[in-house]
Swiss-Prot record:
Listed GO MF terms: DNA binding; DNA-directed RNA polymerase activity; ribonucleoside binding
Catalytic activity: RNA(n) + a ribonucleoside 5'-triphosphate = RNA(n+1) + diphosphate
NCBIfam families in alphabetical order: PRK00405.1, rpoB
Protein's UniProt keywords contain Transcription: yes
Keyword Transcription assigned: yes
Protein name as catalogued: DNA-directed RNA polymerase subunit beta
Gene expressing this chain: rpoB
Role according to the record: DNA-dependent RNA polymerase catalyzes the transcription of DNA into RNA using the four ribonucleoside triphosphates as substrates.
Organism expressing this protein natively: Yersinia pestis
Highest taxon, organism lineage: Bacteria
Keywords: DNA-directed RNA polymerase, Nucleotidyltransferase, Transcription, Transferase
EC number(s) reported in the record: 2.7.7.6
Gene Ontology CC terms: DNA-directed RNA polymerase complex
Amino acid sequence: MVYSYTEKKRIRKDFGKRPQVLDIPYLLSIQLDSFQKFIEQDPEGQHGLEAAFRSVFPIQSYSGNSELQYVSYRLGEPVFDVKECQIRGVTYSAPLRVKLRLVIYEREAPEGTVKDIKEQEVYMGEIPLMTENGTFVINGTERVIVSQLHRSPGVFFDSDKGKTHSSGKVLYNARIIPYRGSWLDFEFDPKDNLFVRIDRRRKLPATIILRALNFTTAQILDLFFEKVVFEIRDNKLQMELVPERLRGETASFDIEANGKVYVEKARRITARHIRQLEKDGIDRIEVPVEYIAGKVVAKDYVDASTGELICAANMELSLDLLAKLSQAGHKQIETLFTNDLDHGAYISETLRVDPTSDRLSALVEIYRMMRPGEPPTREAAENLFENLFFSEDRYDLSAVGRMKFNRSLLRDEIEGSGILSKEDITEVMKKLIDIRNGRGEVDDIDHLGNRRIRSVGEMAENQFRVGLVRVERAVKERLSLGDLDTLMPQDMINAKPISAAVKEFFGSSQLSQFMDQNNPLSEITHKRRISALGPGGLTRERAGFEVRDVHPTHYGRVCPIETPEGPNIGLINSLSVYAQTNEYGFLETPYRRVRDGVVTDEINYLSAIEEGNFVIAQANSNLDDEGRFLEDLVTCRSKGESSLFSREQVDYMDVSTQQIVSVGASLIPFLEHDDANRALMGANMQRQAVPTLRADKPLVGTGMERAVAVDSGVTSVAKRGGTVQYVDASRIVIKVNEDEMHPGEAGIDIYNLTKYTRSNQNTCINQMPCVNLGEPIERGDVLADGPSTDLGELALGQNMRVAFMPWNGYNFEDSILVSERVVQEDRFTTIHIQELACVSRDTKLGPEEITADIPNVGEAALSKLDESGIVYIGAEVTGGDILVGKVTPKGETQLTPEEKLLRAIFGEKASDVKDSSLRVPNGVSGTVIDVQVFTRDGVEKDKRALEIEEMQLKQAKKDLTEELQILEAGLFARIHAVLVSGGIEAEKLSKLPRERWLELGLTDEDKQNQLEQLAEQYDEMKSEFEKKMDAKRRKITQGDDLAPGVLKIVKVYLAVKRQIQPGDKMAGRHGNKGVISKINPIEDMPYDENGTPVDIVLNPLGVPSRMNIGQILETHLGMAAKGIGEKINAMLKKQEEVAKLREFIQKAYDLGDNVCQKVDLSTFTDDEVLRLAENLKKGMPIATPVFDGATEKEIKELLQLGGLPTSGQITLFDGRTGEQFERQVTVGYMYMLKLNHLVDDKMHARSTGSYSLVTQQPLGGKAQFGGQRFGEMEVWALEAYGAAYTLQEMLTVKSDDVNGRTKMYKNIVDGDHRMEPGMPESFNVLLKEIRSLGINIELEEE
């Protein structure tokens, strides 16, 4: 494998045995591709904004004299960039401008004669844009639109599985679900009649809809039944015989023909009898007259002479009717063929309960059902029915729906109209009846072929269309009202409804969520999440067990492990690593093609529907060098089941062992040795890890760490190769390689880094460069590490030396004992940044003022404020300190004469304002790292605001000037090269000032052209700089657009440093979570023979019952990795020659059985080997991919190489007594995470606080400064102890006895510690509640 210079700094030893056939795809593509589809111009108009416009336009006036046509649209440039939007709290969006054409037709002239055409570009609101990391900035906060898994449009056949009716009879139903429009359901009732429902309303006999479609009774019977023809000849009745129809019947008479008896009376007709009849070619037999009684006529029979109806279609025949028919000269009688086995008379029965007789009465019935209480007219009824399923405005199956519909009905073509046709409805009914008759299967609703993904783009398009439809109504009215000659398209369109619909979706839809920004993994997982909830989806309460369950089609598409615990389990899933959506929105997963038992490198993506027809081998099947299966029988999946197949039968093979899991689960090493429940917790808890101060790469990883770190967007990645020209904490400058440059550019890339910003979860986002000056860079190399990344690899926690042993009960019930060394070394210290805002409003009594002049506040409290009343940057503040001084005017109170006198004497004016300053919340202490002041346009800026503005201008100028200088230097270097190659001496050039170089002329024409091109570019660059500077200045100095009534907003950012402490929650990656019980002095921790103490002591009893053995294997492998690191460290300290070092490291990389990774250190220079060794001395990082990891044998070999016992256990000594422990203890390195459940955020005690309005009891919870609830069971406990006085004060003065508690306060102030309990308020509430039920209760005095 070829490594770039940067990748050679630290190479992770990979134990994977299977070669990587397919690179891991870009992990955020589901979001970015979907949104790209939404905003890019689509000439076909199949999706995105284009489709929405084309579906609504052209809009015609009611009279048809004019119409508004859509021409094209364009998105403008956003006003602010992403960072500015976050700071200012605005939405990152671009204006949408649409070109519309108003066409006015001549009134009297023939149709289509154009009188006037006006074209104009119209503003249609703002469209939020996606940032490059797949998020949206809405009102300054980053949000993610989660993809939705919903039922695909189309037709579904299902049954109630016998649950509806008490008899347990299975009732079948069919449902046509459009993308938008009314649902159409067909269902059987227990009596086997077929009913129809529209939009889940009252049911009607299904034949009503057929009558509404203009079918007559005879046509309906013709559609659904086969015919049996009886002939009357010579007063004898003959029946046309189709032998196959007789199977399974019992003969009610002797079946004979040509004098031969084929079946005797009362015998069952078998396949042998049928073969005999067919062989002899018998096509009609004589039947007794009674046989026809009870049969149903297929059409109307009329007496030709009188025109009288003898027998209507669907009537049962009797012997009388037969005689009448015979008299009227009808010799042939068509009846319906039905039997109880597989030709039920369902439609015939339904027609009997159908109250309607013709189209009109059917339409009226449907109208009454849809609009009860409205008088139906013929026109209204026709319109309603027409609009339900046959109008393109109201009904759309969509391309997906039509494809699914046609596939379900086994039609050949997959395209077609978006509305329903007569055939569609009748074929659905036919198929439903076939299923009831025992032919065909019901669909599995949880099959991923019947559920599809709706991503951002599609949902935004739907919302946009909703907005457009609202506008359409208004436009129609304007077109028919006004004076068209003076109207322009702009006057028709009101952008408000459109932007309101879009804003509502991005701001408050259930699927638009506040981004989980704890760490890079939680961001990536959030963007790849798939939810079955949301508008048009399921609800938590109604979702049954089946929907939540893992389905065989989830394989490779949806992760079976990662899903939340609790009420949402199984409803919110995560996309598998390699999964993607196809054009219809169904999930696909890649497979390698297998031909004649040989696995090729051809890769096909299959959806769940396509996959069902193939035999698919697992990724860990053994292959020889040519890719042929070694075993004759291979374990494969087919039609959702797993079994053995011969190698010739195999069609496909999995691409990778990680294919079935999501990104989160693929980061758990030895996942294959963990119980699924614990793996679920492990995958979920990794997302809650807080980025530590110093990120530390996991010693034992899975090889996915780099992909996650790079794709998440928290690192800075090189867009083009080159060399590092300049690097500091906030900027990296790369001089681009010649071959990657565009002609005529300076060839300089500048990467500005993010410094100490707040994330959505209040953790700290900070980037640090990880390249040095002069280093060669290749495209895709990581230049700067973000939060929780280390040299471009995800690093969520720290590698800790753990021992599995009990220690004095401090690790009882999953508690964790931690060494003080962990705190001293700041291993789990995290930085949290809080934003506190102070808003100054315009009140009725006058404006609030931000000032340092606050009434009744001492000097000390104001010591950290500047003269504007805003805290200094760098000030260390604690709970209760003032951050921003603010006073609010209060209403004039009536003054007593004494007060008036005092006022007159001392001139005190401050008492007409009250202090409403922003203070640090209790329990928080930290350092102020940033202050921002936003001032409304037209309000004078205070001194601090001007200072900040000045500083920002200075910084912007400095940045842009430096950028210009860097670009100029690059450009002049190229000019210099051109001039020297053109024959001018370098010495002479150095004497000329650089600006004059451009004036020189060259004889060589090509060179002169080059020079002119560069000169042109130089001018362009300078004017560009001026433009940028002007724009920057404008943005910084302009006032801010604040909410109505707000004059000023001051935002203060506090950085809080939190060390680990008892009560914090920690976890490993295998679901092994616990709370820190004690931080133990280093000298008391158990230590080994070398005197090295362990960092953490875990309880061994937490392993066997939880069955997450992965943590033990990780511990052993971590120990081996550390052992090898220590050996390398010893060699470096001894300053061994590079050859020895190279040999040892090579040995470590080569270890393992037929491992794929090949690292050839002979191609590395000595410097590169030394740098690699330097990065490996803390431990050699190891990758053990999911389901393809290190074996026990390999772990033992690695332990041996590191000079450690192969048992993985060592002798430990007690730190307090120095005595050896009885038996050896498992010690090793485990990757531990500190989770975002910190005791500081949870600890809370109430003093005096607010009370609930109704019950007058203290509120609950930290946010409300609430109390601890003394609940029902606690009361029982006190009752059981007989602690009457304690109980009394709990239920009265400490809770809701209003008078009692004020009296008690007064008593305590007076130094008298008695209490006088009264009536608890909750008792009054109870009385009121009983009275509200009409029962009068009164309290009587004794």
